[in-house]
Structure formats: structure tokens, C-alpha cells
């Protein structure tokens, strides 16, 4: 659960920094 939360957070940060469309739901 913790890893999943961190993964989502990291993905969100990467999405903002890269300004790329989210491919993960």
C-alpha cells in the first residue's frame, strides 16, 4: 500500500514535470 501511494505520487510528479499525458489510471 505504501509503495503504491509513493508510486502514484512519483508518477504525478513526473507527469507534472514532463507535462506528459497520464497513461496510468
Curated annotation (Swiss-Prot):
Hemagglutinating activity is stable when incubated over the range of 20-70 degrees Celsius for 60 minutes but is almost lost after incubation for 60 minutes at 80 degrees Celsius. It comes from the Eukaryota. One of its GO terms (molecular function) is carbohydrate binding. Hemagglutinating activity is stable over the pH range 4.0-12.0 but decreases below pH 3. Keywords: Glycoprotein, Hemagglutinin, Lectin. Transmembrane segments: none annotated. Signal peptide: none annotated. The keyword Lipid biosynthesis does not apply. The keyword Glycoprotein applies. N-glycosylated. Homodimer. D-galactose specific lectin. Binds in decreasing order of affinity: melibiose, N-acetyllactosamine, D-galacturonic acid, D-galactose, methyl-alpha-D-galactoside, D-galactose, methyl-alpha-D-galactopyranoside, methyl-beta-D-galactopyranoside and lactose. Binds also the glycoproteins globotriose, asialofetuin and mucin. Possesses glycan-dependent cytotoxic activity against Burkitt's lymphoma Raji cells and erythroleukemia K562 cells. Has calcium-independent hemagglutinating activity towards human erythrocytes. This is Galactose-binding lectin-2. It comes from Aplysia kurodai.
Amino acid at each position: 500500500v505504501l509503495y503504491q501511494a509513493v508510486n502514484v505520487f512519483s508518477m504525478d510528479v513526473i507527469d507534472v514535470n514532463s507535462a506528459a499525458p497520464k497513461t496510468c489510471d
